[in-house]
A protein has these predicted regions:
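Nucleotide/phosphate-binding catalytic cleft detector across ATP-hydrolyzing
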Residues: 1-65, 73-191, 197-226
């Protein structure tokens, strides 16, 4: 009877998770009441959620940027051919915004404000435009509330530094990928999922540096959940 009541659970994990970490995740799920635990690597779930047919012998490149990590993988025949996971996700972009405002203006802002700034004017594109956002925080000198107008152009360098590291990791994965699959990827391009993939200009940066087209998947923020 207990077996019938306990659910089977599928959990997504970063592609670079270690055996020790995997066991810890499984044990935690079992202690929480799971009967059976299945671990799915995030790029696989993201690809399925993005409606990519990974069952065929052709190669597909997926970039999934979550809150804490960016997972890159080349997928083919229902498996991962090459992969890399780096600890650079949406949270790192937010932290970069916080650090810039603190160092440049002595303005302290919270995580929610940083994310709002990133979503409203954050870009790594070649032409950031003239957009401006009013940032509200606390002046570190006076301790009083303060508002400052920040432009997309001045914010771009701190975001670009992180984005370039992600693109470099993608290049590393491609360099280790068999030539025939690289040819497929040149045709199909890269599919981007996760909340971090919504950063404006990231697709342009990938296209410029890697010479392949890049496209944000439909419902990018939900792809991993859908694919699970």
């Amino acid at each position: 009877q207990n077996a019938l009541l306990k659910p089977r659970v599928a959990l997504c994990v970063p592609s670079a998770i270690t055996d020790v970490e995997s066991r810890a995740v499984v044990e935690a799920a079992v202690k929480a009441g799971a009967r059976k635990v299945y671990l799915i690597e995030e790029p696989v779930a993201a690809a399925i959620g993005a409606k990519i047919d990974i069952s065929k012998p052709s190669g597909h490149l997926v970039l999934d940027i979550g809150g804490g990590t960016a997972d890159i993988a080349v997928l083919s025949l229902n498996g991962i051919v090459q992969k890399e996971s780096i600890k650079l996700g949406g949270d790192k972009f937010d932290q970069a915004v916080v650090r810039y405002l603190r160092e440049r203006y002595g303005l302290l802002i919270g995580e929610k404000m940083a994310e709002m700034v990133k979503r409203e004017i954050g870009t790594v594109g070649r032409e950031p435009g003239n957009e401006v956002f009013d940032v509200k925080g606390r002046n570190l000198t006076t301790g009083l509330p303060e508002k400052r107008s920040i432009s997309a152009a001045e914010l771009r360098p701190c975001l670009l530094e992180i984005a370039q590291q992600i693109v470099s990791a993608m290049q590393s994965v491609l360099e280790r990928t068999p030539p025939e699959l690289v040819g497929d990827i040149f045709t199909s391009g890269a599919v981007m999922t996760g909340g971090g993939s919504l950063l404006r200009g990231l697709d342009e940066l990938i296209e410029e540096k890697l010479h392949i087209k890049a496209e944000v998947a439909e419902s990018a923020e939900e792809c991993v959940a859908i694919g699970t």
